[in-house]
Amino acid sequence: APEEWGWHGYHYSGFDQQYAITHGMDHTPDREGVTKGMDYVPWLLTQWKAAGHPIDVFSLHFYPQEGEYSDSDKPEVERARNRSTRDLWDPTYKDPTWIDSVVALIPMMRQWVNQYYYPGTPIALTEYNWGGEHHMNGATAQADVFGIFGREGLDIATRWGDLAPDMTVYKAIKLYRNYDDHGGAFGDISLAAHTPDPDEVSAFAARRKADGAVTLVVINKRLDAPAHVRISLTNLPDQGKVQVWRLADNVLTHEPDTKYSEGVLTATLPQQSILLLVLPREKKASVKRS
């Protein structure tokens, strides 16, 4: 709860939003008379806290507002998908739509729940969708969103809409959750990963608790150009084996294993493609005593 639909729902009550349809936003009765100028959701959290502990998870909905939530493959919409995932985390990104504000949704949700409710309460995004479900641009957006959710510490996410195995977005999700059809998944302990321009190429890393493998997802969002990446690996062995999965042109493939050396891994990603690299944990040699 409260499952508010989006930006205005976070800041204004349902009554104020309806009132504004015919009267504009200059006078908002609930904000002036009930919340006393507080944004609606923070005010609601204070009321819930005063009532005890009525909710176990703080949840909202969010949809980007530049036409991304569609199946459009127009270049302007695809470029919007590439950048608007920053609404989920980036305190320097001002949303260019009618929102006209920094969103930084996941940090904002965490700050609200810690300040106005009970610190550490799980946070959830129980509706979201970046569209492009039948295009590689939608797949790269979904992969970017999943990586952001993990890195930023979102506890629960439920995507709005049906999925089918032939959809690009389905395959992007599979790359994270079951890439080998045997439960192989992206790691659950987030590791730092940085790229110079996440609107062009983004990357996410995590270690798996189960077997200690390091998993790395690299996403080439470029509409019409490959990405040549040089990955510097720190706090890992200087050399080792790498398992490779790739999603390109709506085909998910397991490619031949490769190796890295001197702490550096290089790869080339076709336009609008996703690369999953799995670095198995090296087994220590055992010594038998006689």
Region annotations inferred by a language model:
Residues A1-N137, Q142:
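Noncatalytic carbohydrate-binding groove/subsite architecture in carbohydrate-active enzymes
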Residues H135, F146-T215, A248:
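Glycan-recognition and catalytic regions of carbohydrate-active enzymes
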Residues L125-W130, T158-D162, V218-R222, I231-N235, ...:
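Active-site proximal loops enriched in glycine and acidic residues that flank catalytic Cys/His/Asp
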Residues A205-R207, E255-S261:
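Short, exposed beta-strand/loop patches in secreted or surface proteins that constitute
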Residues Y260-S290:
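C-terminal beta-strand-rich structural cap/linker in extracellular carbohydrate-active enzymes
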